[in-house]
Curated annotation (Swiss-Prot):
Cofactor note: Has some activity with cobalt, magnesium and calcium, but not zinc.
Name of the protein in question: Beta-1,3-N-acetylglucosaminyltransferase manic fringe
Gene: mfng
InterPro entries: Fringe, Fringe-like_glycosylTrfase
Compositionally skewed regions (Basic and acidic residues) per UniProt: 55-74
Family designation: Belongs to the glycosyltransferase 31 family.
C-alpha cells in the first residue's frame, strides 16, 4: 500500500524538480546576458556619438565651404576699374606747349580731360583757361636727368595725394588709348604690386650705384622707358615711398646718376625686388612703328612718333588725313577711335569706331 502511494507521488515530485531546474537555468542565462546587453548598449551609444561627430564635421565643412564661397563672392564683387581710377600724368616742357602738347589736347586728352594731369615747368594761361589740369612744377626746363626726375617726383607725390588706384605716366609725344589701357589694367589683381611697361633695351640696364665712402657697385635692372609710358599700381607706389616720396626720388636718381624712368625701375627691381612686367602694348619713337599692322593699332595702349634719319617714324595708316596734314598719324588714329569728334571728316561719323569694332 505504501509502495503504491510512493509510485503515485514520485512522478509529481520529479516534474516539480524539473520545473525548478528549468527555471534556475533560465535565470542563469539571463544573468549571463546582462553584460553583453550593456556592451551592446555601449556600442549603440558609441555609434550614435560617432554619427553625431560625423554630422558635425560635415556641417562644419559645409559652413567652411559656404564661408569660402561668400569670401570668393566678395572678391569677385570688386567694382570694375574705371577711367576715374587712373591718374594719367603727362610730362612736358614749356617749349612744346604749342606743338606736341597741343596735339594731345586736341586728340586723346580731350577724352580723358578730368583724369589727366599735365606736369610742366612753365605756366600757360591758355591751357589752364580751357579747364585742363596743369601742374606747374619748380623743375628746370632742361632735358637732364635731374630735371626729368624732378618732374617724376612731382607726378608721384600728386598721385599719392589722390584717391586713385593707378599711376600711368606718358610723355608729350605719346597717344594714349584709354580703352586699351583699361583692358590692360583690368587683367591685373586690384591689390597687386604691378609695374608694367616696355623696355627700350633688349637687356637689363647696367649702372653704378654710389655707396658711402665714395665706393660704387655694379647693378642691373629692367626699366620701362618713359617714352612709351608705364603704369604703377597704388600698392606698389606705396611701397616705393622710402625712395620716392618728397625729395627722396631725386636723391635716389642721384645715387645711380640716371633719369626718371631708370630710377623707377631701380627702385622697383633693386630696392623692392619686384620684377617689371613687360608689355608690347606700349610704344615709343625708339622702335620702328611702321611694323605695327593697322588691325593691331586700336589694341595698343600707347603710340608715338618722331624723326629718324630725316624720316617720320609713325604708324602706317591710310585715309582720313594725308601724311602732310597728319605726320604723327595721331589725328587719324583719333578719328578712327572717336569718329564723332567735331573736326573728324563727316564721312566717318556714321561708321563704327575702332572701339566698337574691338568690343564686338
Amino acid at each position: 500500500m505504501i509502495l503504491r502511494r510512493l509510485f503515485h507521488v514520485l512522478p509529481a515530485f520529479a516534474f516539480t524538480l524539473f520545473i525548478l531546474v528549468l527555471l534556475d537555468l533560465q535565470l542563469r542565462t539571463r544573468s549571463d546576458q546582462k553584460p553583453q546587453n550593456a556592451h551592446d548598449g555601449h556600442q549603440r551609444t558609441t555609434f550614435i556619438s560617432e554619427t553625431t561627430a560625423e554630422n558635425q564635421h560635415r556641417d562644419g565643412a559645409h559652413e567652411k565651404e559656404k564661408a569660402e564661397g561668400q569670401k570668393w563672392t566678395e572678391v569677385r564683387s570688386t567694382p570694375p576699374l574705371e577711367l576715374s581710377d587712373i591718374f594719367i600724368a603727362v610730362k612736358t616742357t614749356g617749349r612744346f606747349h604749342k606743338s606736341r602738347l597741343a596735339l594731345l589736347l586736341e586728340t586723346w586728352i580731350s577724352e580723358t580731360k578730368e583724369h589727366t594731369y599735365i606736369f610742366t615747368d612753365s605756366p600757360d594761361a591758355d591751357i589752364s583757361s580751357e579747364g585742363f589740369n596743369v601742374v606747374v612744377t619748380n623743375c628746370s626746363p632742361e632735358h637732364s636727368h635731374q630735371a626729368l626726375s624732378c618732374k617724376m617726383a612731382a607726378e608721384y607725390d600728386y598721385f599719392m595725394a589722390s584717391y586713385k588706384k593707378w599711376l600711368c605716366h606718358v610723355d608729350d609725344d605719346n597717344y594714349l588709348n584709354p580703352g586699351a589701357l583699361l583692358s590692360l589694367l583690368m587683367a591685373f589683381p586690384a591689390d597687386g604690386d604691378i609695374y608694367v611697361g616696355k623696355p627700350s633695351l633688349d637687356r637689363p640696364m647696367r649702372a653704378q650705384e654710389l655707396l658711402e665712402g665714395n665706393k660704387t657697385r655694379d647693378v642691373h635692372f629692367w626699366f620701362a622707358t618713359g617714352g612709351a609710358g608705364f603704369c604703377l599700381s597704388r600698392n606698389l607706389a606705396e611701397r616705393m615711398a622710402p625712395w620716392a616720396s618728397g625729395p627722396r626720388f631725386e636723391q635716389t636718381s642721384a645715387v645711380i646718376m640716371l633719369p626718371d624712368d631708370c630710377t623707377v625701375g631701380f627702385i622697383v627691381e633693386r630696392r623692392l625686388g619686384i620684377s617689371m612686367i613687360h608689355s608690347n602694348m606700349f610704344h615709343s619713337h625708339l622702335e620702328n612703328l611702321l611694323l605695327l599692322s593697322p588691325s593691331d593699332i586700336p589694341k595698343q595702349v600707347t603710340l608715338s612718333y618722331g624723326w629718324f634719319e630725316s624720316k617720320m617714324n609713325s604708324v602706317e595708316l591710310k585715309g582720313v588725313f594725308t601724311k602732310d596734314e597728319d605726320p604723327s598719324r595721331f589725328r587719324t588714329v583719333h578719328c578712327l577711335l572717336y569718329p564723332t569728334t567735331s573736326w573728324c571728316p563727316v564721312a566717318l561719323k556714321s561708321a563704327l569706331s575702332w572701339n566698337q569694332h574691338v568690343m564686338h
